[in-house]
């Protein structure tokens, strides 16, 4: 199984680090190239875009700081929901309000994805 991880800040880095250390095949993406390089050095592969990452994984984990950031990586033609393969699962570990969570779950469901 290949896992995608988007958001390698303080929280995301700690979580993703444990996944990589346990030998899981991980593809990473972050807006900060230095954060990505740290995980490439640990054995993860990287994606140049969210779309590229989502298209090649079965499980996608996001861990971003704000609702606007979550919407930015999940929605739209280049987002996770449009590009995660059929049957793909998304786990959101982001800091979100309940209204955003409910909206994102509905958007995922429209596309046959699990949120």
Regions flagged by a language model, labelled:
Residues 1-62, 88:
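NAD(P)+-binding Rossmann beta1-loop-alpha1 motif at the extreme N-terminus of oxidoreductases
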Residues 80-86:
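Short, conserved loop/helix-junction motifs that constitute active-site signature segments
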Residues 62-78, 94-102:
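Beta-loop-alpha module in the N-terminal Rossmann-like domain of NAD(P)-dependent dehydrogenases
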Residues 41-47, 71-75, 113-114:
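Short gly/ser/thr-rich secondary-structure transition/capping motifs
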Residues 17, 21, 75, 106:
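Short, well-ordered alpha-helices that flank and scaffold nucleotide-derived cofactor binding pockets
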Residues 4, 70, 91:
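Residue-level signature of catalytic and energy-coupling elements of molecular machines
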Residues 89, 94-115:
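Rossmann-fold NAD(P)-binding glycine/threonine-rich loop
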Residues 52, 79, 103-106:
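Alpha-helical scaffolding segments of alpha/beta enzyme cores, especially the outer helices
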